Amino acid sequence: MAASCGGRVVVFPFPFQGHFNPVMRLARALHARGVGITVFHTAGARAPDPADYPADYRFVPVPVEVAPELMASEDIAAIVTALNAACEAPFRDRLSALLSAADGEAGEAGGRVRCVLTDVSWDAVLSAARGLGVPALGVMTASAATFRVYMAYRTLVDKGYLPVREERKDDAVAELPPYRVKDLLRHETCDLEEFADLLGRVIAAARLSSGLIFHTFPFIEAGTLGEIRDDMSVPVYAVAPLNKLVPAATASLHGEVQADRGCLRWLDAQRARSVLYVSFGSMAAMDPHEFVELAWGLADAGRPFVWVVRPNLIRGFESGALPDGVEDRVRGRGVVVSWAPQEEVLAHPAVGGFFTHCGWNSTVEAVSEGVPMICHPRHGDQYGNARYVCHVWKVGTEVAGDQLERGEIKAAIDRLMGGSEEGEGIRKRMNELKIAADKGIDESAGSDLTNLVHLINSY
């Protein structure tokens, strides 16, 4: 454990599961190195459970009220903008109260506040902390390459790369190799100008932060991290994989679906590297037709699988029953769960492939466990992640087409797991990447984490 100089870090995760988990995992890594933690969190259904965390954590609810119908929508730009607008004043009030308590009764407050550590999506939080004279560190839970897209987004819109047009989708983006136009970050469900404005605010707040922390492998994204460091002129740290740097621990929000651990017992009875794990994360959704195609693609492939069908995965339906005829085809070789302990599933020796939406957390976890991927990005940064996985690192294969189709699904599974030369090459490269990731934990990520603790203790 690193020596602590006393005081605490105020940690404020963004209330989406894919953002929340890495920030809380990072907080646990800092805590293990002697840093006191106070968690600010949105109140209500998206609050963390204190029982899941060390006894000396402190939890401070921040009332953030956004219309439920907006939160239930897929308009990411509007949701994030509304959350920031609703959060700024109550966050400032609670941080001010904590600062006053720390000045008056350090025992009650747990020591003085050294800094705020928050998701870069909370641009209002970064600005409010700075306004109160508190150093603020931003955490990027996506890749460094995605942050580089954030930085260039307004230019990409102004130059006509976005919105994506059919006739240009395969064109190279000269300003951002290795991206093609169709790989660029985007959300079809929100207004492009509003999204560009949001990213502009995120970058502006990040430039004025006291430092940026990326959940990424330093050895994979070294060049991109260097470009960001030079352009932003703030300290930059890379800490990944957090699932290897920090002991396994629960990090979840009230109201999230609990993981079904029964699938692990089922995996125990399967042959090594024979099972395909299928999960599209905590937010991606698909149309009912695609769900049917995916079910039949898995059935037709004839390979054992664990499939996560979470509530609200299928647009317009709260849950998903297998289509008629599929259950009989997959009985005994397919397990469907509402949620899975993903890190443990990917680490299981029976798992030989991961059919994924290519969210960044899932990508990091797959690389850290050496599990090759079948990629079908759905929105946001997933297109760019798939570009790196399949065409730069070459540790995965893509399902052809914009919509899931059973024949293309079966073909992708056969390419990866059917003993082909392509599949063997993918597995070999993924194993090499895993070895490099394991080596980099101590050499790079661990040292960046140590340097981050030193920075925090210097405040």
UniProtKB/Swiss-Prot annotation:
So what does this thing catalyse? DIMBOA + UDP-alpha-D-glucose = DIMBOA beta-D-glucoside + UDP + H(+); DIBOA + UDP-alpha-D-glucose = DIBOA beta-D-glucoside + UDP + H(+)
Matching entries from Pfam families are given as: UDPGT (PF00201)
Could you tell me what this protein is called?
DIMBOA UDP-glucosyltransferase BX8
What tissues harbor this protein? Expressed at the same levels in roots and shoots.
What is the relationship between temperature and activity? Optimum temperature is 45 degrees Celsius.
Gene symbol?
Bx8
Record SUPFAM superfamilies: UDP-Glycosyltransferase/glycogen phosphorylase
Species whose genome carries this gene: Zea mays
Task: Tell me the classification of the organism that encodes this protein.
Answer: Eukaryota, Viridiplantae, Streptophyta, Embryophyta, Tracheophyta
Q: How does activity depend on pH?
A: Optimum pH is 8.5.
Molecular function as annotated in GO: 2,4-dihydroxy-7-methoxy-2H-1,4-benzoxazin-3(4H)-one 2-D-glucosyltransferase activity; quercetin 3-O-glucosyltransferase activity; quercetin 7-O-glucosyltransferase activity
Cofactor(s) the protein needs: Mg(2+); Ca(2+)
Q: What keywords does the record list, in alphabetical order? A: Glycosyltransferase, Transferase
Q: What is its EC number?
A: 2.4.1.202
